[in-house]
């Protein structure tokens, strides 16, 4: 199982889009400024997901950025991604590990539940994600995580990801509470200047 103690920074998640050219045009300039990229597209069919994931795999490899596939271990295996992110209904860690191998990065959404994080760690997950910390338009959720949850999860010994409506000004608070990675979608992709936005998120780790 890979060790990710040095994982720190911006965990960028792609938006839902069918425009592959636009997705790549926006994402490529961001790769030098992020730690991980997660491919997530809930609107695309299987063929488009494969095409987009394949293109992003090549781009990430060129920039040395790990690519994580959202919710689909089979797609991760197909494109040679570095890992998979599992939500509540996306299968078990053990099954993903069996498919992707010992070196894969497997993350689990834990929402506002420390017990879910403990179970994920026990099952062999490589990181745990909590959120939403703030209101977000990206995903409808009534679950609200708190900074105290990040602190409590330190005992797991895994990288902790914070997600959900986070702005650059809120990054220092979450990092102080224990977040190793800040996951963001619209805060970067919907910004007038996505590169400046991702740099602002990154700067929050040094404040």
From Swiss-Prot:
Signal peptide: none annotated. Binds 1 Mg(2+) ion per subunit. Belongs to the thiamine-phosphate synthase family. 4-amino-2-methyl-5-(diphosphooxymethyl)pyrimidine binds at residues 38-42, 70, 109, 139. This is Thiamine-phosphate synthase. It is an enzyme of class 2 (transferase). InterPro entries: Aldolase_TIM (IPR013785), ThiamineP_synth_sf (IPR036206), ThiamineP_synth_TenI (IPR022998), TMP_synthase (IPR034291). PANTHER family: THIAMINE-PHOSPHATE PYROPHOSPHORYLASE, THIAMINE-PHOSPHATE SYNTHASE. Condenses 4-methyl-5-(beta-hydroxyethyl)thiazole monophosphate (THZ-P) and 2-methyl-4-amino-5-hydroxymethyl pyrimidine pyrophosphate (HMP-PP) to form thiamine monophosphate (TMP). Pathway: Cofactor biosynthesis; thiamine diphosphate biosynthesis; thiamine phosphate from 4-amino-2-methyl-5-diphosphomethylpyrimidine and 4-methyl-5-(2-phosphoethyl)-thiazole: step 1/1. Pfam families: TMP-TENI. GO terms for cellular component: cytoplasm.
């Amino acid at each position: 199982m890979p060790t990710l103690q040095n994982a720190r920074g911006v965990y960028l998640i792609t938006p839902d889009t069918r425009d592959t050219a636009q997705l790549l045009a926006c994402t490529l300039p961001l790769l030098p400024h992020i730690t991980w990229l997660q491919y997530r597209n809930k609107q695309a069919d299987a063929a488009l997901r494969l095409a987009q994931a394949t293109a992003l795999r090549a781009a990430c490899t060129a920039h040395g950025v790990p690519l994580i596939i959202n919710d689909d271990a089979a797609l991760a295996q197909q494109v040679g991604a570095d890992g998979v992110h599992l939500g509540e209904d996306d299968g078990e860690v053990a099954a993903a590990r069996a498919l992707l191998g010992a070196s894969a990065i497997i993350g689990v959404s834990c929402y506002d539940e420390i017990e879910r994080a403990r179970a994920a760690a026990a099952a062999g997950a490589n990181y745990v994600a909590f959120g939403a910390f703030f209101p977000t338009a990206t995903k409808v959720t009534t679950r609200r995580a708190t900074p105290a949850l990040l602190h409590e999860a330190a005992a797991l010994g895994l990288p902790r990801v914070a997600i959900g409506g986070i702005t650059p000004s809120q990054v220092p608070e979450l990092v102080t509470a224990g977040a190793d990675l800040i996951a963001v979608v619209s805060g970067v992709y919907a910004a007038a200047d996505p590169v400046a936005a991702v740099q602002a998120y990154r700067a929050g780790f040094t404040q």
